[in-house]
Every structure is written in structure tokens, then in C-alpha cells.
């Protein structure tokens, strides 16, 4: 119990780290229409079969405050869960988000799942998108993930150690994607 990390303990000043690339729903939609290359299919399978084993190690690290897995509600939905539960605002940097190969191109070709739209309807009122975020990009942000990565809220001084651990464990897409501020909801810049 001393090492349990919930999705409701993010603190103002924390940085946000994502462990896996995004876009599994987009890739799955393309696969169903036989429009996903063999190389991209291999990446999709590798991502969905990579277990989130570092979660137990991260939970033991001082300065890691909150963890959640990004799954069916997409990145925005799970960021909203952290914001709501922690009574903070989550700010995400769209340019920093790690997309799996060709996901933006596939999404622009219309490979957005119906679940993505339903996700937006469920929580969109709590999300503030920059004017530069297109409807397609919004669909990518709400894209449901199968076996998605972990969204981690940690102190800035701990972030380099978190990223080193993740990269050593084979989480090549792991990167910082935003931070936690005072307020409420989720903002994408």
C-alpha cells in the first residue's frame, strides 16, 4: 500500500510523461480497411503487446505522484481523470506528443474510430483545445488505445530518472508531454 499510485494525486508543478506512442485506434481502423502497411502493423502489435511493467518500479520512486494507463478514453480522457481527481489543470503540448509511425497521415485520410467521437462527447466540455488543433487532431487526442502507455505525473527533478528508467526498459517513445498547473480541466496548446 505504501507504493500505490493513483490517478488522483497529481500536484501543481508536476510534469507529465507518457510511456508509449499514441494512435493504436487510428492504426486499427486502417488495418480493418486493409490500409495499414506491414511495417506499421508490426509497430502496432509491438506496442500493444509491450506490458507496462515499469509501473511497479515507478510507484516506488519518490516524486512520482500519479499514474494511470491510457486506454479506451484516449489521452484526453485519462488526462481529464487525473485533472478531475487531483483538482488540478493538465496542460498538454500537442507538438510534444509521441505518435506511432504514420498516425497523423492515416488520421488525415479518415481513419478515426467512432469511439473517438463518443469520447469527445463524453468529456469534451472539460477540454480546452488551442485554435490550431484541427478536428482530425482532436480525433487523434481522443483515440482509444488498446494496451496504451502510462501517463505519469511527477516532480520535475525526478523526470530525468523516470525517462531513463523507461528508455532502459525499452519504452522508446517515452517523453515529457505537459505539466500540471492550478485550475481545472485539460488544455492542449
Kindly give the residue locations of the regions a language model identified.
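A structural signal for small-residue-enriched, beta-sheet-centric alpha/beta enzyme cores
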Residues: 22-23, 52, 67-72
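Residues on a specific face of well-ordered alpha-helices
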Residues: 11-16, 20, 24, 42, ...
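Glycine-rich tight-turn/loop motif centered on a GG-T
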Residues: 1-2, 32-44, 87-91, 111-112, ...
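A generic local secondary-structure boundary/capping motif
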Residues: 1-9, 56, 80-81, 139-142
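Residue-level recognition of alpha-helix initiation/capping sites
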Residues: 1-7, 49-50, 74, 157
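Glycine-rich anion-binding loops of enzyme active sites
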Residues: 1-36, 178-179
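Active-site glycine-rich loop that binds ribose-phosphate moieties when present
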Residues: 1-3, 39-60, 133
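Glycine-/charge-enriched secondary-structure boundary and capping motifs
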Residues: 61-189
